[in-house]
């Protein structure tokens, strides 16, 4: 199967939608104060997403800069939203900044002043077409009626105030668009948030100097990222105050909240400070208690708080208690031991049991494996598939104890890895699985980290182009909504939103990694690469960036990072060293061995020529565990199979030396195979290979003056059988540039 086709196929399987998950959706529509793509500016709609619980509601921000209540309708953008609306959904509607001015100027976006039913017919200067222009209030009333006709709840929001002060007060719109928005909501019996008045009061309490810091430079209309965050927090509180509206049920708690990574049955990392964080009412005292320790802190102005519990020894079970004067949370059956992040694409997401929850699942002999999975000291947190444009506070998921019922849905690689660590080290083990089928590595890296590297500029520019194209094409969103409405079973219609595409930069970091940072952990294991075959040339830089990014996020420059080199795939070739995309990707992956505190599990011997998802996940997990036990826990033994160290030409042969020999080299079965040599013309032929102590000597009567050697240099290097004394396979390599 061609790699790109594989990626598209799996994306179709893995792309989730709010409709099929049965959750309500909040749609946000408005102008640039709600969503802004101008550098240095941000609208409140994007950070508002992080205030909602992703397990309860989906949030889609369809606001776009430069639009008014009139043009959002005439450009077909509202029709695109309507195509998605279903009973139980919500729509937040904020316009007004662009509704003033001349009706028929170069933008043709102004609406008639007021809330009346009067209209004016114009011939637009922009395209010569006739248009009947309504009042600002009439457009809002249409949005309200249309939303209600679909069973959704519309919420009208008055426009945010501009940063213009007079006599110590900030300007309001109580007799203009703010008033007309309120009147329209009242006429149609819709919910109304007087955001203009609420924010004006909050800005005045801050004063002109601090308020200026919430806006983008000298711009008095558009907020900075800090201002957008501030406004989003105010909006979340305003939503909580709505009467006869269930939208607040989808919000994260406003009094005392901790992210879902904190739940019953969690495992906390031993031997290092343990961060515990969340939100509470600004200024409130938050007290955290665990194992006889108590740490307190005051919530910041934005409600956020964090404490770092002193290092703990492995023990438990405990109860973690978090309280404020007005609220408390308690988490039971908390263990202290070793915590590992387990991430990557479908081979990491591949579950122990064959299950309908995953398209690729079920290890060899999975029924017996699941039945035997009784490991109460092993727990797993599985993050739900989530992609976002901006970093989130929460990802859906919960900790589960390893028993036959829960283990069926465990990542198989993570399970075998964790089981081996638990049995060898003898302490509780917690596994945090953040994996997404068909994902690229750049999807897991922070945007600021990617931006620092010029070699990733093309990836970021292309993603930016896709986002702009999708933003400017309401028909694509409308067509997707129509397809969802018709969908009953089978493959879910593909979401055209590039933010909901796991091939694009930073979207999985924002949705799945950001919410669990800075949960204390020992290290990370990684199984990914298939979806980056087309960018294998920059993969060494990408994997290095990922490692550096995670080490920076967790404040640990030596955070262990152990990863899987791609398994054998596709039909074996008769060519002695055919190469191929997968062979080159393995070379790209191996480059990370130069980074300290890393290790690579070689899997060329356990692949499946017909399936990129080999079912022998036990060997993969055990090899990763071996890397961790020797590299992180100091256990004796060799971490992996032989890894190329150097080669030297001696007459008509080449002598090859390896690291991680561990008492000698062996051939797994029969004569040593898999080597090819060539002179400077690089016409490789099969080589005769012989083990001499800890070295391999290769030659061929066809090559009198050998210059280069390759080993297992194929997508499926069938027959390559060099091992060390522990029967661990040697890593593929080539010496030709």
Q: Whereabouts are the PLM-identified features?
A:
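Positively charged n-region of N-terminal signal peptides that target proteins for export
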Residues: 1-5
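Bacterial N-terminal signal peptides
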Residues: 7-17
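Boundary at the C-terminal end of the N-terminal hydrophobic targeting segment
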Residues: 18-24
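Cell-envelope and extracellular/periplasmic
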Residues: 24-35, 42, 50, 54-55, ...
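Conserved, well-structured core segments that form or line functional sites
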Residues: 137, 141-162, 166-168, 175, ...
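Short, electropositive alpha-helical surface patch
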Residues: 154, 161-162, 167-180, 209-218, ...
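C-terminal/domain-terminus segments
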Residues: 159, 167-170, 175, 241-252
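Low-complexity, Gly/Ser/Thr/Pro-rich intrinsically disordered linker/tail segments
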Residues: 223-252
């Amino acid at each position: 199967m061609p790699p790109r086709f594989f990626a598209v196929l799996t994306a179709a399987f893995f792309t989730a939608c709010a409709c099929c998950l049965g959750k309500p959706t909040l749609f946000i529509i408005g102008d640039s104060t709600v969503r802004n793509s101008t550098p240095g500016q941000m609208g409140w709609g994007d950070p508002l997403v992080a205030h909602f619980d992703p397990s309860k509601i989906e949030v889609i921000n369809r606001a776009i800069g430069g639009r008014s209540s009139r043009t959002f309708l005439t450009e077909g953008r509202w029709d695109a939203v309507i195509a998605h609306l279903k009973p139980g959904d919500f729509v937040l509607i904020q316009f007004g900044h662009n509704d003033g001015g001349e009706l028929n100027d170069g933008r043709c976006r102004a609406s008639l002043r007021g809330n009346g039913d009067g209209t004016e017919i114009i011939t637009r200067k922009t395209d010569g077409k006739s248009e009947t222009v309504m009042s600002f209030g009439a457009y809002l009333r249409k949005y309200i009626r249309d939303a209600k006709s679909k069973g959704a709840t519309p919420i009208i929001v008055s426009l945010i105030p501009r940063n213009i002060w007079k006599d110590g007060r900030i300007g309001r719109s109580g007799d203009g668009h703010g008033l007309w928005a309120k009147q329209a909501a009242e006429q149609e019996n819709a919910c109304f948030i007087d955001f203009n008045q609420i924010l004006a009061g909050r800005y005045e309490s801050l004063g002109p100097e601090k308020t200026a810091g919430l806006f983008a430079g000298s711009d008095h209309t558009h907020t900075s990222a800090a201002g957008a965050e501030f406004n989003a927090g105010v909006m979340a509180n305003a939503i909580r105050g709505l009467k006869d509206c269930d939208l607040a049920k989808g919000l994260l708690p406003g009094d005392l909240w901790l992210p879902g990574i904190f739940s019953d049955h969690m495992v906390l990392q031993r031997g290092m400070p343990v961060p515990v964080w969340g939100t509470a009412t600004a200024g409130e005292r938050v007290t955290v208690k665990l194992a006889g320790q108590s740490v307190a802190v005051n919530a910041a102005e934005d409600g956020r708080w964090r404490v770092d519990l002193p290092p703990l020894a492995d023990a438990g079970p405990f109860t973690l208690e978090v309280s404020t004067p007005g609220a408390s949370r308690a988490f039971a059956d908390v263990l202290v031991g070793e915590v590992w992040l387990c991430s990557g694409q479908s081979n990491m997401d591949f579950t122990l049991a064959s299950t309908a929850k995953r398209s690729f699942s079920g290890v060899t002999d999975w029924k017996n494996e699941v039945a035997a999975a009784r490991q109460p000291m092993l727990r797993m947190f599985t993050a739900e598939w989530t992609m976002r444009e901006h970093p989130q506070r929460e990802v859906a998921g919960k900790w589960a104890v390893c028993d036959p019922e829960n283990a069926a849905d465990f990542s198989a690689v993570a399970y075998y890895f964790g089981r081996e660590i638990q049995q060898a080290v003898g302490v509780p083990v917690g596994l945090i699985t953040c994996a997404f089928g068909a994902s690229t590595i750049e999807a897991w890296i922070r945007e600021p980290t990617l931006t620092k590297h010029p070699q990733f500029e093309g990836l970021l520019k292309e993603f930016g182009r896709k986002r702009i194209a999708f933003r400017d094409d309401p028909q694509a969103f409308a067509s997707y909504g129509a397809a969802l409405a018709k969908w009953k079973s089978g493959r879910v219609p593909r979401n055209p939103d590039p933010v909901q595409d796991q091939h694009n930069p930073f979207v999985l970091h924002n949705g799945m990694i950001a919410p669990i940072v800075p949960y204390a952990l020992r290290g990370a294991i990684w199984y990914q690469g298939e979806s980056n075959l087309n960018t294998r040339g920059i993969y060494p830089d990408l994997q290095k960036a990922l490692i550096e990014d995670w080490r920076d996020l967790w404040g640990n420059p030596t955070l262990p990072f152990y990863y899987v080199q791609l398994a054998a795939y596709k039909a074996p070739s008769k060519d002695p060293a055919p190469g191929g995309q997968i062979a080159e990707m393995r070379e790209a992956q191996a480059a990370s061995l130069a980074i300290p505190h890393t290790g690579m599990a070689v899997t060329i011997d356990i692949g499946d020529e017909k399936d990129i998802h080999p079912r022998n996940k036990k060997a993969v997990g055990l090899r990763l565990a071996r890397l961790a036990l020797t590299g992180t826990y100091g256990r004796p033994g060799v971490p992996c199979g032989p890894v190329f160290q150097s080669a030297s030409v001696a007459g008509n042969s080449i002598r090859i030396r390896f690291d991680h020999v561990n008492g000698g080299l062996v051939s797994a079965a029969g004569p040593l195979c898999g080597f090819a040599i060539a002179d400077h013309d690089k016409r490789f032929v099969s080589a005769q290979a012989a083990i001499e102590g800890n070295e391999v000597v290769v030659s061929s009567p066809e090559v009198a003056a050998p210059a280069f050697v390759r080993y297992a240099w194929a997508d499926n290097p069938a027959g390559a059988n060099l091992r060390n004394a522990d029967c661990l396979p040697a890593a593929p390599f080539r010496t030709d540039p």
